[in-house]
């Protein structure tokens, strides 16, 4: 098999025209004949490039409002023809070989994302000729290069220059993989969209299926292979969504440290998503996907100091997330005080990075600033299936709370209640969080009974010498019995925030009144499993 194939004729037809003129100029300068269609051909001609319209090349005009442009034997025969095997039939039918196909597809995703997009608009943005050429070229990658990403343009020209105008089989095969990934993702988007239109399309209902289509096709790109998974006997890799806009662990840049492990990524995600909940300078310390210390303050240094005090033992080997730039003082405090696996922040000063560089094993991630949280889907794998739900972006403000007890909370109790309610959302259920003066003082996570989570939170506060008297307590779900309130009162809690909704709410409220506790209902639950 010939490893290198010269590029003498290329067909260019792109929706995203970024970089296409420069790429076409580079090809033309290297003696490559250019074929093109529609808007791409007009653009290249306007730039003075010698380009042949596909309709002139085939002798068959574009028709049906551009629906039929490249679906012709002279095009697909030129792409699919096997060099050295189909030469005679190609010559008989005057089919010239096409050595490179440069195609990206109609912007279907952008079209259906527009408000008010009709089914007719969506249908007209389903590319037919493009995917057909892409698949044809990818199938015949032994002889043809298929280019679907503008990010590959420069590398292709460099390789052609290094190989007297040719591309290697390894490159063509790699480009073919990208091509099949591209068409698979494209067809998945269309299938998901059409699936979401059922049953409205068939008149079975006035409403479309909505957020969850009949079949779910997912497209993720591998970012890295892992040494192992959650445990050393499990193989693992990290896949990310394409074109993610929101700052996340998936989009973050690692500026120092060892490669991230499976557990590092999971824990860093938990820490970052929690710290995003706060507008004030905040620090979140996470261990095994649970916050073990959270605080807000006037500076991230003080926020870190206070978060660390919640549970210094658990903070060892933890993940630390900030919602402000990592500065030198805070970096020094962390490095001097504890062993840390990962630090993630929107940015880091040069001085801070010089300090963390002294501990080369510490992983430092820069994620950039974030704006409004983007809606999306959460997935949970079960044996033989996949549970899918909206991301839990729900949160309540002070004006949405209901005071259900005789006593009203003080201003500080209310602030602490809202603070620990935000934290409880990220603690594994059953979750109980004690907070005072904008810092956690005890966290009870993952217990099978809510009362034991409440007891553990109190024990942790006592172990660290943190005063519980006058604190607020958050529960991620309702109290089924009064025992959780009794345990909180015994520890010194004076305000409780919880969803409400138990058949025994009256008993729970009565217990709060007996202890002089103010109780707030959120009418929103935050289970986390």
UniProtKB/Swiss-Prot annotation:
InterPro entries: AICAR_Tfase_dup_dom_sf (IPR024051), Cytidine_deaminase-like (IPR016193), MGS-like_dom (IPR011607), MGS-like_dom_sf (IPR036914), PurH-like (IPR002695). It comes from the Bacteria. GO terms for biological process: 'de novo' IMP biosynthetic process. The modification N6-acetyllysine is found at residue 287. The IMP cyclohydrolase activity resides in the N-terminal region. It catalyses: (6R)-10-formyltetrahydrofolate + 5-amino-1-(5-phospho-beta-D-ribosyl)imidazole-4-carboxamide = 5-formamido-1-(5-phospho-D-ribosyl)imidazole-4-carboxamide + (6S)-5,6,7,8-tetrahydrofolate; IMP + H2O = 5-formamido-1-(5-phospho-D-ribosyl)imidazole-4-carboxamide. One of its GO terms (cellular component) is cytosol. PROSITE patterns: MGS (PS51855). Keywords: Acetylation, Hydrolase, Multifunctional enzyme, Purine biosynthesis, Transferase. It comes from Escherichia coli O81 (strain ED1a). CDD domains: IMPCH (cd01421). NCBIfam families: PRK00881.1 (NF002049), purH (TIGR00355). Pfam families: AICARFT_IMPCHas, MGS. GO terms for molecular function: IMP cyclohydrolase activity; phosphoribosylaminoimidazolecarboxamide formyltransferase activity. Its EC number is 2.1.2.3, 3.5.4.10. Belongs to the PurH family. The gene is purH. This is Bifunctional purine biosynthesis protein PurH.
């Amino acid at each position: 098999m010939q490893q290198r194939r010269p590029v003498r004729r290329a067909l260019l037809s792109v929706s995203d025209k970024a970089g296409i003129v420069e790429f076409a100029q580079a090809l033309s300068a290297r003696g490559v004949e250019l074929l093109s269609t529609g808007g791409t051909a007009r653009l290249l001609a306007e730039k003075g490039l010698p380009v042949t319209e596909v309709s002139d090349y085939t002798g068959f005009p574009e028709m049906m409002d551009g629906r039929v442009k490249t679906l012709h034997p002279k095009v697909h025969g030129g792409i699919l023809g096997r060099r050295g095997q189909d030469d005679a039939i190609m010559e008989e039918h005057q089919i010239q070989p096409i050595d490179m196909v440069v195609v990206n597809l109609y912007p279907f995703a952008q079209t259906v994302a527009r408000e008010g997009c009709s089914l007719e608009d969506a249908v007209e943005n389903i590319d037919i000729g493009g995917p057909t050429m892409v698949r044809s070229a990818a199938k015949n990658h032994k002889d043809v290069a298929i280019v679907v990403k503008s990010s590959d343009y420069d590398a292709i020209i460099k390789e052609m220059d290094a190989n007297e105008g040719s591309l290697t089989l390894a490159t063509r095969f790699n480009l073919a993989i990208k091509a099949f990934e591209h068409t698979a993702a494209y067809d998945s988007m269309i299938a998901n969209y059409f699936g979401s239109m059922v049953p409205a399309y068939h008149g079975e209902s006035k409403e479309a299926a909505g957020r969850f289509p009949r079949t779910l096709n997912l497209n993720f790109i591998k970012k890295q292979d892992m040494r192992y998974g959650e445990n050393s006997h499990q193989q693992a890799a990290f896949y990310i969504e394409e074109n993610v806009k929101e700052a996340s662990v998936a989009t973050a840049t690692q500026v120092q440290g060892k490669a991230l492990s499976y557990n590092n990524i999971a824990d860093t995600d938990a820490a970052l998503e929690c710290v995003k909940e706060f507008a004030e300078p905040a620090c979140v310390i996470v261990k095994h996907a649970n916050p073990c210390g959270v605080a807000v303050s006037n500076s991230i240094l003080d926020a870190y100091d206070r978060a660390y005090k919640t549970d210094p033992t658990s903070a060892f080997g933890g993940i630390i997330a900030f919602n402000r730039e990592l500065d030198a003082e805070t970096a020094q405090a962390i490095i001097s005080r504890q062993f840390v696996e990962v630090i993630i922040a929107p940015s880091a000063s040069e001085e801070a990075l010089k300090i963390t560089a002294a501990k080369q094993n510490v992983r430092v991630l820069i994620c950039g600033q974030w704006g409004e949280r983007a809606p999306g889907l959460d997935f949970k794998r079960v044996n033989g299936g996949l549970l899918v739900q909206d991301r839990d972006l729900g949160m309540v403000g002070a004006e949405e709370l209901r005071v259900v007890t005789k006593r009203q909370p003080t201003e500080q109790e209310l602030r602490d209640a809202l603070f620990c309610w935000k934290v409880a959302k990220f603690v594994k259920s059953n979750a109980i969080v004690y907070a005072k003066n904008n810092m956690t003082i005890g966290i009870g996570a993952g217990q099978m009974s809510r009362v034991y989570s409440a007891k553990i939170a109190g024990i942790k506060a006592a172990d660290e010498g943190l005063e519980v008297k006058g604190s607020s307590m958050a529960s991620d779900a309702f109290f089924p019995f009064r025992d959780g309130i009794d345990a909180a009162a015994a520890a010194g809690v004076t305000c409780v925030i919880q969803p409400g909704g138990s058949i025994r709410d009256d008993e729970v409220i009565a217990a709060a009144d007996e202890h002089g506790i103010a109780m707030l209902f959120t009418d929103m639950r935050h289970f986390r499993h």
